[in-house]
Regions:
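Extended ligand-binding regions for polar small-molecule ligands
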Residues: 26, 69-78, 159, 228-266
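Ligand-binding clefts/hinges and TM-proximal coupling segments of bilobed small-molecule sensing domains
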Residues: 27-31, 160-175, 214-217, 246-280
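Periplasmic-binding protein-like
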Residues: 50, 127-134, 199, 207-244, ...
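Short helix-initiation/N-cap motifs at beta->coil->alpha
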Residues: 85-95, 140, 174-189
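A ligand-binding cleft/hinge motif common to bilobed small-molecule-binding domains
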Residues: 95, 109-117, 164-167, 189, ...
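Flexible hinge/capping segments at coil-to-helix
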Residues: 35-37, 135-153
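C-terminal motif of bacterial Sec signal peptides marking the signal peptidase cleavage site
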Residues: 21-24
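Extracytoplasmic small-molecule ligand-binding "clamshell" domains
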Residues: 31-108
Length: 280
C-alpha cells in the first residue's frame, strides 16, 4: 500500500511538471516580439491611404509625403530602420494590423471613442476638431448638425464621421479611398451635400483646390480630438518604442517643424475656437 501511495504522488508531481511545461510554452508563444522583429528585419511597415491630403498623399514628384507620413519616416530614421508604406482604404488599414501585415497605421486616426479598446494608441501628434464642407452657393442647406437629416454625406464606410452623419439622419454616400478633388467636386455638383472630417485636413484641402466652389461651414465646429498612430493590441513593445521617439521629437522641436510645414499653424495644443462636443 505504501508503494502505491508513493507512485501516486510521483504521478501527480510528473503531471504537475508537464502542465507547468505546457504553460511555459504557451507563455512563450504569446511573447511580444513586435519590436525585436522590426529591429532584426531593419524595416518598419506602415499602413496608410495615400489619398488624404495633407496627411498622406503623392506630391507632384510622385513621392508619398504628408504630415503622418513624414512623422512616420522620422520615427523609422531614429529607430535606425528603413520604412515601407502599404496603401489601403481605412478598413484595409485597420485590417492590416489585425492580420499582421503592418506594424502600425498612420492616417490621421482619431484617438477617441472606443478605438482604444481595440488598438494601442500612440502619443497624440495632432490636436484638432471636426467640421463640415458644404457648397459655397447655398451652404448645402445646412446651418447646424441637426440640418444633416436627409442630406447626402460623403465619406469612407465605417468611419466615425459617417457614423455621426448617420446618427443625425444623413444619407450615406460611400467612397473607396477617393481623392480630395473627387470628394469636393461631388459636393459642388450636388452628387453629395456635405463632408464631415478633420478641420485642418478640410482647411488645407479647400485651399489646395480653390477652383472647386465649396467651403468649410463657418462656426459649426464639433468634437475636439487628438490624432496619432494605431497599433495592434499585442504590439506593446513596438508601441512603447515609437512613443518614446515621438516624445523625443516633441521635445527637440522636430514634430513642430513637420506640422508647421503642412498646417501652417500650431496643432500641438488644442484650438481656442468654440467647439461643440457631440456623441460619436
Amino acid at each position: 500500500m505504501e508503494t502505491i501511495k508513493i507512485n501516486k504522488w510521483k504521478n501527480i508531481v510528473i503531471l504537475g511538471a508537464f502542465v507547468m511545461l505546457l504553460g511555459a510554452c504557451g507563455s512563450k508563444a504569446k511573447e511580444d516580439n513586435s519590436l525585436s522583429r522590426v529591429q532584426e528585419s531593419k524595416e518598419l511597415t506602415v499602413a496608410t491611404s495615400d489619398t488624404l491630403f495633407p496627411s498622406s498623399y503623392y506630391n507632384d514628384d510622385n513621392q508619398l509625403v504628408g504630415y503622418d507620413v513624414d512623422v512616420a519616416k522620422e520615427v523609422a530614421k531614429r529607430m535606425g530602420v528603413s520604412i515601407q508604406f502599404k496603401e489601403y482604404n481605412v478598413d484595409g488599414q485597420v485590417a492590416s494590423l489585425t492580420r499582421g501585415e503592418a506594424d502600425f497605421a498612420a492616417n490621421d486616426f482619431g484617438l477617441s471613442g472606443d478605438r482604444g479598446e481595440k488598438f494601442r494608441l500612440s502619443e497624440p501628434i495632432k490636436h484638432s476638431f471636426d467640421s463640415m464642407i458644404v457648397r459655397k452657393s447655398d451652404d448645402s442647406g445646412i446651418a447646424s448638425l441637426d440640418d444633416l437629416a436627409g442630406k447626402k454625406a460623403a465619406g469612407e464606410p465605417n468611419t466615425s464621421y459617417m457614423k455621426l452623419a448617420e446618427e443625425y439622419g444623413a444619407k450615406l454616400v460611400t467612397y473607396d479611398n477617393a481623392t480630395n478633388d473627387q470628394y469636393l467636386t461631388d459636393v459642388a455638383n450636388g452628387r453629395t451635400d456635405v463632408i464631415l472630417n478633420d478641420y485642418y485636413l478640410q482647411k488645407m484641402s479647400v485651399a489646395a483646390l480653390p477652383d472647386i466652389p465649396v467651403k468649410i461651414l463657418e462656426d459649426v465646429y464639433f468634437n475636439p480630438n487628438e490624432t496619432g498612430f494605431l497599433f495592434a493590441k499585442d504590439n506593446q513593445a513596438l508601441h512603447d518604442e515609437v512613443d518614446r521617439v515621438l516624445k523625443e521629437m516633441k521635445a527637440d522641436g522636430t514634430l513642430k517643424e513637420i506640422f508647421e510645414k503642412y498646417f501652417q499653424t500650431d496643432v500641438s495644443v488644442p484650438s481656442d475656437k468654440e467647439i461643440q462636443k457631440v456623441e460619436k
